UniProtKB/Swiss-Prot annotation:
The active site is at 80 (nucleophile). It is an enzyme of class 3 (hydrolase). Catalyzes the phosphate monoester hydrolysis of phytic acid (myo-inositol hexakisphosphate), which results in the stepwise formation of myo-inositol pentakis-, tetrakis-, tris-, bis-, and monophosphates, as well as the liberation of inorganic phosphate. Myo-inositol 2-monophosphate is the end product. Keywords: Disulfide bond, Glycoprotein, Hydrolase, Secreted, Signal. This is Phytase A. It comes from Emericella nidulans (strain FGSC A4 / ATCC 38163 / CBS 112.46 / NRRL 194 / M139) (Aspergillus nidulans). Its EC number is 3.1.3.-, 3.1.3.8. Monomer. Phytic acid is the major storage form of phosphorus in plant seeds and, thus, in seed-based animal feed. Phytases are therefore of considerable economic interest.
Amino acid sequence: MAFFTVALSLYYLLSRVSTQAPVVQNHSCNTADGGYQCFPNVSHVWGQYSPYFSIEQESAISEDVPHGCEVTFVQVLSRHGARYPTESKSKAYSGLIEAIQKNATSFWGQYAFLESYNYTLGADDLTIFGENQMVDSGAKFYRRYKNLARKNTPFIRASGSDRVVASAEKFINGFRKAQLHDHGSKRATPVVNVIIPEIDGFNNTLDHSTCVSFENDERADEIEANFTAIMGPPIRKRLENDLPGIKLTNENVIYLMDMCSFDTMARTAHGTELSPFCAIFTEKEWLQYDYLQSLSKYYGYGAGSPLGPAQGIGFTNELIARLTQSPVQDNTSTNHTLDSNPATFPLDRKLYADFSHDNSMISIFFAMGLYNGTQPLSMDSVESIQEMDGYAASWTVPFGARAYFELMQCEKKEPLVRVLVNDRVVPLHGCAVDKFGRCTLDDWVEGLNFARSGGNWKTCFTL
């Protein structure tokens, strides 16, 4: 942490001396295996707007397959790649920048770029950077599980959003590219086998929408607004002093911080140029921002929401079905028509890949109890990732996030389950976990009582 503090402080000192956006000369800091390691002192604290970066080094347990074991099954659950802002946010960002340009009477130092900044970001779709992320993800998946991928074609599903489907397709491109370089592979090119519509009334385990009480709950919005009201005023005052003539809200402050990530991800195909928006803010402010995003996800979709984990029950029960090769037992968000048909939900595959959104993935992780060690997050002060027991939006659901659910066969007869989130081994809960973070399959499934019992899903439809 001391190195982080010194490095980040140095970065901000230098960024305030120069008005030029930092640039790396090549994209060796952005690789398929390590993810986005460019400008890590800032890019790794953007919450869910961080691009995927491997956190293998943060794991107390090696991600390598233990000696004497082999992986016999893998399910990857992935978020889509980096995207442009949503349509509503894109309009808000553009309007804010126009207002600053209209009202500010001077632009100096790190703010000079704002005077002539032209907002050209699109809305909702993947950026080229995001497309490349998913190509890298597919290639990494093939190489990591080559022994299985050589002989098995993954069964692939995607939630129906354009950016999610496009992410699945780019993942396939990367998988196929690695496959073609492996002369030992004889399998056909994968395809997106199932696209689950994101429409009202259509059950979809990869996108929440059907739990009425959950969708109408505004508690997380209130918690986010309260924390923004704590961190926002000092930043707002400083920006208003530095840019005379402007008036900002606390929400405006967060929007300007959002632009750091979105502008960076849109500038180049590999993220080699850091947006000048980033240098407007300090180390402390970025840590507050990162925590704000984690807070929002925890109380919006995780254990901090009464019905957050319930949104992940359906997928959890689908994973149980795949691991045990038995019919899906679920009465929550699963689509019975799809899940009862071997053509749309086979149970005999060795490789599965599903593509989703950050919010749904948070719910799934908490439905599985992966972060049961995380205590309720403070609503008024920043906690470290260590204090949150490894939970953070940037560590769990960055753009291009991926969780690997592995089944291993070792010397003993009974298979073992292991879970990695962005390359970090997450020790399992609710079962007898070994030194490698694993539990036997039967023990882990038995420990998933919340999901197997349907949790509190029935309260979704109570007034």
